[in-house]
Amino acid sequence: MASGVRGMTLDSILQPDALAAKIAVNYDNWNMARQVWMDQKREIRNYLFATDTTTTTNSQLPWKNSTHIPKLCQIRDNLHANYTAALFPNDRPIKWEGDDETSEALDKRTSIEAYMNNKMRQSGFRTEISKCLYDFIDYGNAFAMPVFIAEKNVDGVTGEIIPGYVGPKMERISPLDIVFNPVAASFAESHKIIRSIKTLASLKADIDDHPEMKYMEDVFKKVMNTRHQFASLNHSDFNKSNAFQVDGFTDYLTYFQSDYIEVLDFYGDYYEQETGKFYKNQLITIVDKSHIIRNIPNPNWLGTASIFHVGWRTRPDNLYAMGPLDNLVGMQYRIDHLENAKADAFDLIVHPVMKIRGMVEDFDYGPGERIFVGDEGDVIFMSPDTTMLAADTQIQIYEAKMEEMAGAPKQAMGFRTPGEKTAFEVQTLENSANRIFLNKTAYFEEVFMEPLLNSMLEISRRNMGPSDLVRVLDNDFAVVNFLKVTREDITARGKLRPIGARHFARNANIVQNLTQMYSSSLGQDPAVAAHVSGKAIAHLMEELLDLERFQLVQDNIRVSETLETQQLAQAGSQMLAERNAPAGPEMAVPTANSGTPAAPKGPAR
């Protein structure tokens, strides 16, 4: 390299845009501000996936044994299983509620619910929600956004374009890939920056195949020109800049000489000081922390970025929430400490320390071994204090406390608690054990899933083609139909509501109360029963048990079905009687010998 190149700086090569540099600085500042939080989450992850204590904080202890009891992991799996069961109790997880008569019409409601149910099933919505639930438990924070997918595959032999999935999709955002202002009034009002690492080929494909993304090709050429300059440079050619850091790469030179590119997507409002212009709800994409490759108004109709966040335990004046496992790490540390201390104590009992006094011949420690000692020689076994063997009791106490504090008691996992219980007590304990699950899942539904589903519907209205075919099951005839849905069919005033945890808890409580009432003397009192509508109770149970689609409840259906059964029984009895009846009388035939007719053979009638 020529001597004139030596001493160059990154800024002289990159020539960063002022706005891009400002966004990059905000990303670095917000990322540094959460390092303590990230260290705490890293410790939790080490305990969750540990196979022994050598990879956890317990490695600092002096114990010889390194057994790890995965209590934290077991609580995590239990919470995830219960959250998933509460969020998706049936195959119809959503319901459309219109804000006017037209939006609440049956055809409109059917089209919207069928379209969204079909897209949720095809796009793997439950799988993505499952991933977000793990973030909800592990990090205490879950993030997601809707995207519109139009997949196309090319047949390698014929060259034919085969259409794939077309429609909205929920996309999980890793809590480690998004930064925001943690002291903002709300997450919706905070600026957000999402970091991603793409290959140069994928970025070029987005520019060529997806013009709707509005990436600027001239900026991509500038990015490639920068990499061509770095291809022939080494560290001795210019001064190192500590300000440029890319996570996942050893240094900036390795990054620029690789096939990867860092992309930062900024969502929010910003004020341009040079021109005095205010930009509201803007989407700005920068690459290499230096160049703006996209700067457009956010295309959604909601007025804010379609990025949604939910926290497990919210903090005052801090948008980073706590998780259910945060307060349990210390107890997990204590459990592993007691387990390995107890194991070392057992080892000292089986292989005790020996104190040798005087002249003692060498011997091998084992059963039946003879030890020869001198006149004043002796071998004394140093027995440890056996109090440590009671550590199992303390471990059980800590495990029970961890389950209770995380809201995951043993009865919620199917383990029976000690003591005799009546049926009412069992039901009461079950409801109490599920209360914290239903509370958290109802909050998850209201704050996270509901706005996310409505945003998926909004992005479908903006991007879908002339029409789409959705699969619908006809409950009357038990056949599958395909409904043609247009953009107008899914355009209405109203909102989608998840009908999982909140409705499941309410319905289960009402059914339990009704069952207990009818089992009591009050419900069996004729004076009370005379004033209770049987039709209303039937319709209520049909709604609570989610049986409307089977049409089990109809006015006086039991009476008509009973009459129909009786008619069939009478018709069957009549047919049987006619079949078993004797033959009729035969007509008399006159003989040739007598002029009198012959007597009838059958009985007289």
Positions of the model-derived regions?
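Short intrinsically disordered coil segments
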Residues: E160-P163, K192-K198, N327, E369-I371, ...
